[in-house]
Amino acid sequence: MNKINKYLLTGIVSLSMTACANLDLNPLSEGSSENWYHDETEIEMALNDLWRPDFFPIDAIYWDDDLLNRNGSNEVTLGTVTSQWGTSSTRWSSLYKSIARATKVLDNGSATGISESKVNQYKGEAYFMLGFAYCELTAYYGDCVLNKGMTLDEAYVATRSPKNEVLAYAFECLDKAAEYLP
């Protein structure tokens, strides 16, 4: 019995000493923000993703009573829209996704071997998206969180910035877009 306990203890200790090296590795076989932006193709793919329809919200026609009859009711016509409303939360998160992706392109969008005119075009598209997204956020929500490169720790405690400050930054981004785009 003592011999079995020794083998059992040795086996448990052996198994407990094995572990994975680092479980926080990005999948090396797939693209991620850590291993992307090496060449022109990857940067263009990242920019093309900024033009997905989710990032350009269109208001529904049934939100207005000018075209449809006034007998129907919905959250907008009743004035009961809250942050829990599906459209509201989806737009908020989609616009911030586009901001994060545009910022990532600005931070990493100048890989070696790309002409200056192409880099400027990439910067222009990313700045346009930043400006557009912040304009949309202020149109829908007024004050919103302004991310000018905050760290993750800062993001956890970030508060909304005044609408006029966000719009000033959005217009600054749109001016840069006009400067960089051909």
Predicted regions and their residues:
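Short, compositionally biased low-complexity segments
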Residues: 18-27, 73-75, 142-145
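Membrane-proximal, proline-rich intrinsically disordered regions
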Residues: 20-63
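Short, small-residue-rich loop/turn micro-motifs
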Residues: 144, 148-150, 174
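Bacterial Sec-dependent N-terminal signal peptides
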Residues: 1-29
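Conserved, well-structured interaction surfaces
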Residues: 44, 75-141, 155-168, 172-182
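Proline-centered turn/helix-capping motifs that create local helix->coil transitions or kinks
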Residues: 21, 58-61, 137-146
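Short linear capping/connector segments at secondary-structure termini
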Residues: 29-32, 80-83, 148-155
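Short alpha-helical hairpin
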Residues: 61-81
